[in-house]
Design a protein with these regions (language model features):
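A glycine- and small-aliphatic-rich helix-loop capping segment at beta-alpha/alpha-beta transitions
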Residues: 94-103, 174, 179, 311-312
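Phosphate-binding site of ATP-dependent enzymes
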Residues: 173-257, 280-289
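Residue-level detector of anion-binding/catalytic polar loops
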Residues: 36, 102, 130, 191, ...
Length: 328
């Protein structure tokens, strides 16, 4: 008997449309011989399931079921692909825990922590993971631009502490640019982070583990003519993505080991993607710096994870089946 899968997408953040595109990708990748799939869109308090023929069914938030002409349907599994709240910060995971529905991502604590970049950086620093120096600021809080510039250095990045897809992120080159950059960041979140600039090569690497396997995908190198890998670069093609990344073999091995270690430190679940900056230390050796973790990475046909799956010689259909079946 086929399992019924909810591909949960949308959400209440600026990333709603990006999430819906990922849902379309996952729907196309899923093994239809094993699973009956519905996209469930969450938007402004409305939860709706979409059949493959476009029919819409309101979803009950009491038990995550919906009525069809053939009777009530219940889901066996939720594949969460919301980028931002409530799917990437632990809220939706808590709901699914309450109704005892298995899902694709890490649990509440891991999702909440990885969504808050400042908290995540400080947590991983305690395990010896290299991260940028940063300062946390809250909306309405007084701050000294010159003191921040002296502490963090210039250039630096200003970003929402809890957000994704580079919404609200600015590269700041002078202290007097901090105030307008913070205003942009505070449009997306209550807290903003001023983070030191790390000069180097940006790469991104996906990973997943199940009860019987550990799969680290080939890393992708990100080359952009933009100031940084911003929203425009990510989603409007202003970037060159090279998979596998052009890394020295020893560096590639160390990055993969770091990716696996971070996954274990977090007790992560499902597919996650970790972004890094590969800089040079004072001796000219490659230094691996963790930049960000994506626990619901993009899943369109051109997103990093599908690219990396292909580069690894794997079938994305089988990878997604691994994620589902690991919960049963």
């Amino acid at each position: 008997m086929k399992r019924t899968i909810a591909i949960v997408a949308g959400g209440d953040s600026s990333e709603h449309d990006v999430s819906m595109r990922s849902a379309e990708g996952i729907l196309s990748f899923m093994d239809k011989e094993k699973y009956d799939c519905y996209v469930v869109e969450i938007k402004q308090g409305n939860w709706n399931a979409y059949d493959t023929d476009g029919t819409t069914y309101p979803v009950s938030r009491a038990d995550f079921s919906f009525d069809t002409p053939d009777g009530r349907r219940e889901f066996d599994f939720a594949y969460i692909t919301i980028h931002g709240t409530p799917g990437e910060n632990g809220i939706l995971q808590g709901y699914f825990d309450l109704i005892h529905l298995p899902y694709s991502t890490s649990g509440v604590l891991v999702e909440a922590m990885t969504f808050d970049k400042y908290v995540l950086n400080n947590y991983l620093r305690g395990f010896g993971i290299n991260v940028a120096d940063s300062i946390l600021l809250r909306r309405g809080e007084a701050y000294d631009e010159e003191a921040i510039a002296k502490r963090i250095g210039m250039p630096c990045f200003v970003k929402p502490a809890a957000d994704g897809s580079s919404f609200g992120v600015s590269k700041v080159k002078e202290a007097d640019q901090l105030a307008p950059a913070l205003r942009v960041a505070f449009m997306e979140a209550e807290e903003a982070m001023v983070e030191g600039f790390m000069d180097g090569v940006e790469i991104s690497q996906g990973i997943y583990k199940t009860a019987d396997k550990s799969v680290v995908f080939p890393a992708t190198e990100v080359v952009t003519s933009n100031e940084f890998f911003d929203y425009d670069a990510k989603y409007n093609g202003q970037v060159q993505e090279i998979t596998p990344a052009r890394l020295a073999p020893e560096t590639a091995k160390k990055v993969a080991e770091t990716t696996s270690r971070i996954y274990d430190i977090l007790h992560a679940n499902g597919i996650i993607r970790i972004d890094y900056i590969i800089s040079k230390d004072q001796d000219g050796n490659d230094k691996i710096n963790m930049l960000e973790i994506n626990t619901t990475p993009g899943m369109t046909a051109t997103s990093f994870i599908p690219q990396q799956v292909r580069a690894a010689g794997l079938d994305i259909k089988d990878v997604l089946s691994d994620i589902v079946e690991n919960q049963f």
